[in-house]
Amino acid sequence: MTQITFKNNPIKLSGSEVNEGDIAPNFTVLDNSLNQITLDDYKNKKKLISVIPSIDTGVCDSQTRKFNEEASAEDGVVLTISVDLPFAQKRWCASSGLDNVITLSDHKDLSFGRNYGLVMDELRLLARSVFVLNENNKVVYKEIVSEGTNYPDFEAALKAYRNI
């Protein structure tokens, strides 16, 4: 079980750990229109999965913007996953000024968080993290940010994404 800190408080993450070299497990989340989405919906595309605790915080907002601005022109897809309600994600997307933002909600049953070992049970939030998957869903990059209020290593994640 991985342990991080969130606002300097120790938090254990629950769920199944996923590592570089693994085939990423499938998951079910909701899009902004309450449609069920799975990893299989992005078959044969490289993926940058940006995981945030909540879209309504400054760090999460910045992380979502940065990855979408830097990686959306690449031949692949950038997915931002949080436990925010789809309605909150839809509101954020409408006000963000960004095109092509894909936000997905793991609020319903934490399928993504549990399958990737990212659930902060005490807070019912997901740990800030980044996964890069190739077209065959092999994990080629993984970062779980050790302090949940800090930024991920944007450059390392983007380099891994671009090098697929």
Swiss-Prot record:
Transmembrane intervals: none
Intrachain S-S bonds: C60-C93
Top class in the EC scheme: oxidoreductase
EC annotation from Swiss-Prot or TrEMBL: 1.11.1.24
InterPro entries named among the record's database cross-references: Redoxin, Thioredoxin-like_sf, Thioredoxin_domain, TPX, Tpx_CS, Tpx_Peroxidase_subfamily
Swiss-Prot/TrEMBL keywords: Antioxidant, Disulfide bond, Oxidoreductase, Peroxidase, Redox-active center
Gene Ontology molecular-function annotations: thioredoxin peroxidase activity
Pfam family membership, one: Redoxin
Annotated signal sequence range: none
Reaction equations catalysed: a hydroperoxide + [thioredoxin]-dithiol = an alcohol + [thioredoxin]-disulfide + H2O
Domain of life of the native organism: Bacteria
Family: Belongs to the peroxiredoxin family. Tpx subfamily.
Remaining remarks: The active site is a conserved redox-active cysteine residue, the peroxidatic cysteine (C(P)), which makes the nucleophilic attack on the peroxide substrate. The peroxide oxidizes the C(P)-SH to cysteine sulfenic acid (C(P)-SOH), which then reacts with another cysteine residue, the resolving cysteine (C(R)), to form a disulfide bridge. The disulfide is subsequently reduced by an appropriate electron donor to complete the catalytic cycle. In this atypical 2-Cys peroxiredoxin, C(R) is present in the same subunit to form an intramolecular disulfide.
Assembly: Homodimer.
Function (record text): Thiol-specific peroxidase that catalyzes the reduction of hydrogen peroxide and organic hydroperoxides to water and alcohols, respectively. Plays a role in cell protection against oxidative stress by detoxifying peroxides.
Name the UniProt record assigns to this protein: Thiol peroxidase
Organism from which the protein derives: Staphylococcus epidermidis (strain ATCC 35984 / DSM 28319 / BCRC 17069 / CCUG 31568 / BM 3577 / RP62A)
Phylogenetic placement of the source organism: Bacteria, Bacillati, Bacillota, Bacilli, Bacillales
